Amino acid sequence: GSASKSDWTVNLNTDKVPYGGSDLAGFIEYAEGPEKDKTVPMVHKGFNDYVNTVLETMVDTNDDGIDEVLFNEILANTDTRVLLTGHSLGGAVATLLAERLVSMGVDKNRVPVITFGAPAIGNAAFAEAYGDSVDLRRITNNADPVPGSLQTFFGGYKQFGKHHKYNLSRKLSDFQHDMGMYFDYSMREYYAALDKAEAAGVREKLPLQKLEGSDPLVAVWIGSSREADKRDYVPDIKRFVMNEYQMMLPRYVIVDTETKLYDDSVYAMEKFYQKARELGADYILIVEIDGRVLNDCEKWYINMNQSVFTVDGGLVTMNSFARFVSPVSGNIQATTFGLEQSREELKKHLPFVKLDQHASPRRL
């Protein structure tokens, strides 16, 4: 996204440069050529300069102490597939980067792109000549001005790609370009599509229990506070959390995802111990999602509480992680922060927990 002064410097460098070439030297030479008319493919100069910098960046990609060009792997290995994604400026750069890689010989199906609230990157001639060479899905919403900003204020730009638009309610009008809002909406749509796929038998559900193997068995309860239960997005958060624990625990049983810890008559601790012993579990994991407005301000926070016990009542670890957000936007993103911290803490006490179930995205 456009998070820093340097990002906005890129955004505001709105001159267009000719687009062409099949390698980095050719890209630079082509862009430095004489100014062309609007019938020639041209792109935003700031975005183009940014992408050229990315293509020549040297990084230690394998943690072996050896720096190499960031995209050498995808250029050299035809089995490698990389999803390029970004918000705002990041989305524009991801799109242009994908086309550069295609121009260098990479099949477009190996570099799909998903953008959120991204501006256009080139003129109509560019969209016509190169639009089909990028496997692009653009996510926008009905109130976000950024995707149309270059067309509106400067002219001569055109969007392309498969377009999906979210329809925001009025209460989200202050967050129309916020990535947290896009994250919340995307997860809701993802779960709706996933439910259809599972119902049709196209996709198997993650099992509510996984018993094979020799690692310790963990009985899992996931719930939410009385205050959080009032929010319509909390079911998405709990499902997101459950899926993460299903991925990180080698052996587990999801006992309940509607745990009301505030109801002591139903959820007395002894009942957790009894149920876990019946299941043959070694550990009890209780996760609670809490969210509320602080009394002295209008800030909202999402709090993730994680507790682990042995089945005989011993406390293994108890921790809580919170993040300030809007009451109506950014809640899945805040939950992700809590999960990252909870996962690291869990690993300290339960060595069998898996930390590498997801490949970490690299920020360009």
Predicted features, each with a name:
Residues 86-90, 94:
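Gly/Ala-rich beta-loop-alpha elbow adjacent to hydrolase catalytic centers
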Residues 120, 199-251, 352-364:
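A structural "domain/chain start" motif
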Residues 309-363:
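Short secondary-structure boundary motifs at beta->alpha junctions and helix caps
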Residues 23-29, 36-42, 48-85, 99-217:
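Serine hydrolase/lipase
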Residues 216-223, 269-295, 303:
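A short, hydrophobic beta-strand-centered structural micro-motif
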Residues 1-31:
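Short, surface-exposed "cap/lid" segments of acyl-processing enzymes
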Residues 299-304, 320:
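Short, surface-exposed coil-to-beta transition loops
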Residues 242-267:
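Short beta-strand->alpha-helix linker/helix-N-cap micro-motif
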